[in-house]
Amino acid sequence: MSYKISVSPEEIEVLEPSSFPGKIKVIDSQGFEFMKAVAYLRRQKVIGFDTESRPCFSASQPHYGVSLLQLSGKDRAFLFRVKLMGGIPKSLRKILASNQIIKVGAAVTDDVRGLKKHHDFEPKAFVDLQKMVWEYGIKDKSVKKMAAIILGVRISKTQQLSNWE
């Protein structure tokens, strides 16, 4: 299959908008909802993976570490507010270290590096979409542009600069 190398903002603007069709749950403690989320994620063969950190807009501003760990299956997404949880619980670190569950994301190396600064785990079975698109001649690596080129949809990333702490 062949794809466009690049896409312009004007081309993206006319595409059909798209968003995650499943349920999204924000979790900030290790209660019943947390346990249900972990059980669901353990049953998945492939999950989506992303992290968010408090925005840093200048070099002199301190870096605060990962605030949010996002993991999703086909029909459910979980936003774990890891700062409020006192870090990443062991059960989530086990998922991140599992060879049995493929974790897919963009700029995965940076996200994993951010997690490893404060949490001990050995990341396994991660797939970085930004590294894969080069094989298809795609030069645009942002999630928004990859979605436009590969899926033909427009996605919004407006929430990515939110302060999840």
Region spans (language model):
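A short alpha/beta connector and helix-capping loop motif
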Residues: 57-76
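Short beta->alpha connector loops
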Residues: 30-31, 52-53, 83-87
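Eukaryotic intrinsically disordered and solvent-exposed regulatory patches
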Residues: 34-35, 55, 91
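N-terminal accessory regions of nucleic-acid-interacting proteins
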Residues: 1-47, 118, 129
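Short acidic, Gly/Ser-rich segments with clustered Asp/Glu that frequently serve as metal-coordination loops
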Residues: 46-60
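Active-site-proximal helix-loop-helix substrate-binding element of RNase H-like nuclease domains
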Residues: 4-19, 70, 75-82, 88, ...
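NAD-dependent ADP-ribosyltransferases
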Residues: 21, 43, 66-68, 100
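Active-site acidic carboxylates
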Residues: 44, 62, 104
